């Protein structure tokens, strides 16, 4: 996602979550047709964006996302575990993944989310 990703992460009191993220500088398609775009534009859009949602549960310093819908279909029905840490003021949430294959390489992702609401 680069150094300046853009996205939203939402957890509800009812136990649902949704996360979406991509680079902040995603190129626009040549057309405004949502289902249009060249094969190259579509491939780049898919390769640079993550979106999934479902249920979540917290156990100690681990949050488990039970994926019910996802842009990446292989995640549907899986559990995505992330270690988390909250800043002292509760405004920053850091999520750390186990090793994941991204772009053909195995990586550990560390995402820092900033709270935007009260």
Could you tell me what each predicted segment is?
Residues 1-51, 58-118:
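Lipid interaction determinants
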């Amino acid at each position: 996602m680069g150094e300046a990703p853009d996205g939203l992460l939402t957890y509800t009191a009812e136990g649902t979550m949704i996360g979406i993220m991509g680079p902040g500088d995603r190129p626009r398609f040549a057309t405004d047709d949502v289902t249009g775009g060249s094969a190259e534009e579509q491939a780049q859009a898919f390769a640079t964006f993550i979106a999934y949602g479902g249920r979540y549960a917290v156990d100690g310093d681990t949050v488990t996302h039970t994926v019910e819908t996802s842009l990446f279909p292989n995640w549907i029905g899986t559990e995505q575990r992330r270690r988390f840490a909250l800043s002292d003021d509760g405004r920053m949430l850091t999520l750390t993944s186990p090793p994941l294959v991204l772009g053909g390489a195995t990586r550990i992702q560390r995402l820092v989310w900033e709270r935007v609401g009260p």
